[in-house]
């Protein structure tokens, strides 16, 4: 029964991700149709077509490899300037790639398609079409996390002490992948929290004269204090207690934006308690912003972190629990959540929705990366064209025409290859050495 529940949870969650992908593509398709861009395909997945049906000029279908999707808009790349259509294909490797792509695309373009090609549309129309997909994922992330926030609550760290750390572990051992290295040893110094007399259950109300209103504020106060004196007041039961003044110490702590990165900052030595907080739209927007900061850092370092995942897979080292994963890994976590016996149904549903919201936020942010073939690359191309033509008008120069985004195809192929190889590495890692949620 445990295996069946696990499989059901993983399969259902995988299906929810694919629905998110389908809605992402609808975010492109609908404005494309509204602005009368010729659209020949709307596909969920890649590779061989499993099922399709044609309505009007557009073929709607599902493909064999469920790792994404696409809309095929005709006329993504403009013809060469002055040619009306194409020049003879040239021998330079990069120019040859661009010419070949243009030639392949123009073979499908008919005379009656004039005015309906993507590159011919106004800049604001192109931007709406390209922003549509990631925006759909942002909406899905907002809605799913709002549902969790209103019905179940979101976990928030507080200024209450959950547990006091006994020792200060040297940075060299903190960064070790061996859990035993991150345990206290004889000779490790006591934490400032122990020396100050901080206890489990205490609520820190004042830090160096500043009244504490949230965990984020308290965390920043401690980090910024470095190795200076700390005067702390706590609420213990129904009493306010001034603790013994101590100096915080400078040591390695997790980065606020990248938990996998250790930075040097002030350290007191305790773990904050968690509480479930219910909030509305404004609260959820704040949570999405905080999540975006962390996910953005992951995306910036994505190639490095994928390389580290591959290296750990080859060498047998423990995988970074905060590292990237594929949709296979996310589905496995959903299966673990669904099959956990000591968690009630409402908690499981909340965790699944929260995970789905996080995946959608990740998809949105990743697609905003300003490199082709991602949506962000096409957005940059449209903006570049608009700025170039605007500057020409301002300085009284001839209209430079459409931006030749086909010249960026070599970059698109490299980025596409990196994404494909990275995805394969993460899928293999998620099968062989999956990240454990519990």
Which ranges hold each PLM region?
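Terminal peptide-recognition signature
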Residues: 24, 62, 193, 201-204, ...
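PDZ-domain C-terminal substructure recognizer with occasional recognition of PDZ-binding tails
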Residues: 199, 205, 219-263
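Small-residue-rich helix-interface/hinge motifs
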Residues: 4-109, 113, 363-393
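Residue-level signature of transmembrane alpha-helical entry/exit and packing/kink sites
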Residues: 5, 9-13, 121-130, 351-355
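Internal alpha-helical transmembrane segments
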Residues: 23, 34, 58, 69, ...
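Alpha-helical transmembrane segments of multi-pass membrane proteins
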Residues: 17-21, 137, 141, 359-367, ...
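Functional transmembrane alpha-helices
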Residues: 113-121, 168-170, 182, 254-364, ...
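Conserved PDZ fold ligand-binding element
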Residues: 189-215
């Amino acid at each position: 029964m445990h295996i069946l529940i696990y499989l059901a949870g993983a399969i259902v969650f995988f299906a929810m991700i694919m629905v998110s992908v389908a809605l992402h593509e609808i975010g492109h398709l609908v404005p494309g149709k509204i602005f009368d861009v010729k659209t020949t395909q709307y596909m969920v997945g890649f590779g061989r077509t499993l099922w399709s049906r044609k309505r009007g000029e557009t073929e709607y279908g599902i493909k064999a490899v469920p790792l994404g999707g696409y809309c095929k808009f005709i006329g993504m790349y403009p013809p060469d300037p002055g040619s009306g259509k194409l020049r003879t294909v040239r021998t330079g490797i990069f120019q040859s790639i661009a010419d070949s792509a243009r030639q392949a695309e123009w073979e499908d373009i008919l005379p009656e398609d004039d005015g309906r090609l993507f590159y011919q549309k106004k800049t604001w129309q192109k931007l709406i079409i390209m922003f549509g997909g990631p925006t759909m994922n942002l909406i899905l992330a907002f809605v799913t996390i709002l549902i969790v926030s209103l019905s179940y609550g979101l976990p928030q760290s507080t200024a209450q002490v959950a547990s006091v750390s006994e020792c200060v572990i040297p940075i060299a051992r903190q960064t070790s992948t061996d859990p035993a290295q991150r345990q206290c040893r004889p000779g490790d110094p006591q934490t400032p929290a122990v020396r100050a007399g901080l206890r489990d259950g205490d609520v820190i109300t004042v830090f160096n004269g500043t009244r504490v209103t949230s965990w984020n504020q308290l965390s920043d106060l401690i980090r910024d204090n470095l190795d200076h004196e700390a005067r702390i007041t706590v609420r213990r039961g129904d009493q306010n207690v001034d603790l013994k003044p101590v100096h915080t110490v400078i040591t390695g702590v997790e980065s606020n934006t990248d938990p996998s990165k250790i930075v040097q900052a002030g350290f007191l030595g305790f773990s904050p308690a968690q509480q479930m907080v219910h909030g509305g739209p404004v609260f959820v927007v704040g949570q999405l912003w905080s999540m975006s900061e962390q996910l953005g850092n992951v995306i910036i370092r994505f190639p490095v972190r994928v390389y580290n995942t591959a290296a750990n897979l080859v060498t047998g080292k423990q995988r970074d629990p905060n590292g990237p994963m594929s949709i296979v890994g996310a589905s496995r976590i959903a299966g673990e959540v669904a099959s956990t016996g000591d968690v009630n149904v409402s908690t499981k549903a909340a965790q699944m929705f929260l995970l789905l919201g996080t995946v959608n936020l990740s998809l949105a942010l990743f697609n905003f990366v300003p490199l082709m073939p991602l949506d962000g690359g096409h957005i940059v191309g449209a903006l570049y064209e608009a700025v170039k033509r605007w500057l020409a008008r301002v300085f009284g120069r001839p209209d430079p025409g459409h931006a030749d985004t086909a010249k960026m195809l070599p970059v698109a192929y490299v980025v596409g290859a990196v994404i494909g190889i990275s995805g394969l590495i993460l899928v293999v890692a998620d099968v062989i050495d999956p990240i454990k949620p519990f």
